[in-house]
Amino acid sequence: MTAISSWSELFEKRKKIKTLYPEIWDISLIKKEMDLLRRLIRDGIRILEIGAGDRRYEDRIKKIAPMVIYKSLDIDRETRQDYYDIDDIHETFDFIFMFEVIEHLTKEEAMVMLKKINSLLNQGGTLLLSTPNLYHPNRYYQDITHKTPFRYEDLGAIMLMAGFDSIKFHRMYNDDFFRRMFRIAIGIYFHKYMEVDFARTILAEGKRI
């Protein structure tokens, strides 16, 4: 049974996202995830990282806000985590982030995951996630374990359907200073003409309503 119960609702939510961001170029450009984490994290909040791997973000986060409570989830039991199954979590968080995970799920699994994440957030809590930018020519296809390509409008739509609000998107691109400036100031016209983006990653944030 599909977790997406209404395809007409999905299409309507997609239109809502496209109204906010008509084209990929309407999405703001940032250098790296930490630019957003610095803005979203503050001392004293409870944080869950999903797909934590080696927990490398724990130290980075605690340099920003030493008093945060950080918990991690990953299905790889060869790594050290607080949780290995999201259904084992019986506490709530102010901020949950999930980088390069959702594309490894089917669209139905992604909807179930987003609804579960929404239930783990305190009211007003924030989810931040990333996924390969489909407007980049080859970013998504560089990993054989990817299951679902998410355009930003589709990702935003299922986030809305899962109970999130105030959806915002960011494109992420970092490079050598001169190459980055060339791409942003001059190369952008070529990229727009070809309808391909140089930003490799899309980040989405949403709040629990």
Could you describe each region identified by the protein language model?
Residues 101-104, 133:
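Hydrophobic adenine-recognition pocket in adenosine-nucleotide-binding enzymes
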